[in-house]
Design a protein with these regions (language model features):
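Ligand-binding pockets and gating/stacking loops
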Residues: 1-418
Length: 418
């Protein structure tokens, strides 16, 4: 278990400094249209094979079409892979961009493009932009990354106020708790390192607050730090144990399922942007075995339940859900029964937050090798997401060298989805 403000804010910020900067940033985003839209980005690190999930080619040669067959969904004319049966029942809630492309088949550079909307120069991640422009809604962190940090998920020149709150722990583990909530002021961190969990710590601080009745000598920034430790919103958001066993099983008792459940709790409690950084999708070998045994059953259950849960709670209209890897996989199967990296064409899935469900935008060619029409890229995706969140992409921000820069260069809002 790691305790400390540097861990909590992901990029070495001291807690009072981060909160002060966050308070200043929050004033820039009030009153914008879309201010109430949150984002859950399920990032499938390594690259989801969308030719085997959301854009199958049953008429292609065997070395392209692979082992899986398409199945019908609850939307006439839209099919998905046979190992996505639960998602097939919720196709009316999501839309598919089947002509998504950026041409970059390299780890790292493609990740950066998909998470920032910029190909080359270091730029802040989408979640950092949302945190910087809008600030926090309450004491719940506005931008959260789980269950592990990603190198391209940071704030870059926006500074520590826009850094993600990192949950560096697997929410599917027994006794899961959030390790990186730092205690304010002179509270001995050793008292928190005994693995009794976040909730016991919060309960103790709450009893102290009730006894003292006031914050005492805290300045306003340290009061906010104390608030993070004691607020009902934060306690509720991180308390997975309060969910019924039935609810937890509905999402799946695995990393992706419990991460999606925690993400729902976070946006319900006030977070603006939650990135789920999920690994093991780089299927260079045994693509079909890995997909049908673990990867797709987990994704199918977690994603379908997230969409159902958000919809039933009346949250889907105000929660944008995005699913993608940094790229797709090659149309042609390699000698190891795998598919390699493929940036020239893949499928991006979007739901909620103002996105109309049950639509397909664009199309790939007969092998899913390149867009057949209406190519759409990361800048368009970024422009659409920022539009839905009410982020002014013309806003000038300043690098550490005081150089003015727009939050996004180019890109169009994908009106076909709205």
């Amino acid at each position: 278990m790691r305790i400390g403000a540097a861990g909590a804010f992901g990029w070495g910020a001291t807690l009072p400094m981060s909160l002060e900067q966050q308070a200043m940033a929050a004033t820039t985003g009030s009153g914008k249209p879309g201010d109430d839209v949150s984002v859950i980005y399920i990032f499938l690190l390594g690259g989801l094979s969308t030719i085997d999930t959301f854009d199958l080619k049953p008429d292609a040669p065997a070395e392209v079409r692979g082992e899986f067959s398409p199945i019908a969904t609850n939307v006439p004319g839209i099919e998905v892979g046979e190992h996505m049966p639960f998602c097939a029942q919720h196709a009316d809630k999501f839309s598919l961009i089947r002509s998504f492309a950026h041409g970059d088949s390299g780890h790292g550079s493609a990740d950066k493009y998909m998470l920032t909307g910029h190909r080359n120069s270091p730029r802040p991640a989408f979640g950092s932009v949302a945190s910087y422009t809008h600030g926090g809604r309450n004491s719940v962190p506005p931008y959260v990354v789980l269950p592990a940090m990603h190198a391209s998920a940071g704030p870059q020149f926006l500074g520590s106020s826009a850094a993600p709150f990192l949950i560096d722990a697997d929410p599917s583990f027994p006794g899961f708790s959030v390790p990186d909530l730092a205690p304010p002021l002179d509270i001995n961190t050793d008292r928190l390192s005994n693995r009794r969990g976040l909730l016991a710590t919060v309960d103790r601080f709450q009893r102290q607050v009730e006894t003292r009745g006031k914050a005492g000598a805290f300045n306003k920034f340290r009061e906010r730090a104390f608030s993070l430790m004691t607020s009902p919103e934060a306690k509720k958001a991180f308390d997975l144990q309060s969910e019924s066993e039935q609810a937890r099983q509905a999402y799946g008792n695995h990393t992706l399922g419990q991460s999606c459940l925690l993400a729902r709790r976070l946006v319900e409690s006030g977070s603006r942007y939650v990135m789920i950084n999920h690994n093991n999708w780089d299927t260079h070998a045994n693509n079909f075995g890995d997909l049908k045994t673990n990867l797709l059953p987990h994704l199918d259950k977690a994603l379908s339940e997230l969409l159902r849960d958000l919809s039933d709670r009346g949250m889907l209209e105000k929660t944008l859900v995005v699913v993608s890897g940094e790229f797709g996989r090659t149309p042609k199967i390699n000698k190891d029964a795998g598919r390699d990296h493929w940036g020239p064409c893949f499928t991006l899935t979007m739901a909620g937050g103002g996105i109309q469900g049950g639509r397909v935008v664009g199309a790939s060619d007969e092998w899913a090798a390149k867009p057949a029409d209406n190519p759409i890229g990361p800048k368009d995706f970024a422009a659409t997401m920022f539009h839905l969140q009410g982020v002014d992409t013309e806003k000038l921000v300043y690098t550490l060298e005081k150089r003015p820069m727009k939050l996004l260069d180019g890109g169009r809002v994908i009106e076909e989805l709205l």
